[in-house]
A protein has these predicted regions:
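Conserved short alpha-helical segments that host acidic/polar catalytic motifs at enzyme active sites
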Residues: 1-146
């Protein structure tokens, strides 16, 4: 039976949070698999990958957790890392900007312009539909490709 925390979703945000919790804490899978659960690769692309057996199993067993956009996820994990990723259609924008002492994620570039007007905008990151951006506590920005 389902954990009581996964019953009665009232918003997309709850679905994303509960899916993240399920994948990372209940199944104890690495965070990198979260993106494969919510926006799996097409079977044609999976077939060409060395980890195809795992990705096919994820796609077949957790298809009910796939999102069908348009959505952008911006979140903070219990270890205080920030993450962001987009649905496979990438209809919702997201941008990551940084200065020497701050990294921020915004759903619109105007949000970054407001709080970081002096940043180097040429270094802004616009995540694509096949990646997760992770920002750790040392403000290191990582881009994890699917």
């Amino acid at each position: 039976s389902l954990h009581r925390g996964y019953i009665g979703f009232e918003s997309d945000s709850q679905c994303f949070l509960n899916t993240l919790h399920y994948v990372h804490h209940e199944l104890k899978w690495p965070l990198t698999y979260y993106k494969h659960v919510i926006t799996p690769l097409p079977f044609e692309e999976i077939a060409e990958r060395p980890d195809k057996d795992v990705l096919i199993a994820i796609r077949q067993s957790l298809a009910n957790l796939e999102i069908n956009g348009p959505n952008t996820i911006i979140g903070v994990l219990p270890d205080k890392k920030m993450i962001t990723c987009c649905d496979s259609k990438k209809l919702r924008p997201v941008v990551v900007g940084r200065t020497d002492d701050m990294v921020a994620i915004s759903s619109e570039v105007c949000g970054l312009n407001e709080i970081m007007p002096d940043r180097d905008q040429t270094k802004d990151i616009y995540p694509n539909e096949r990646e997760i951006v992770v920002i750790d506590n040392d403000l290191e920005v990582q881009r994890w490709k699917q």
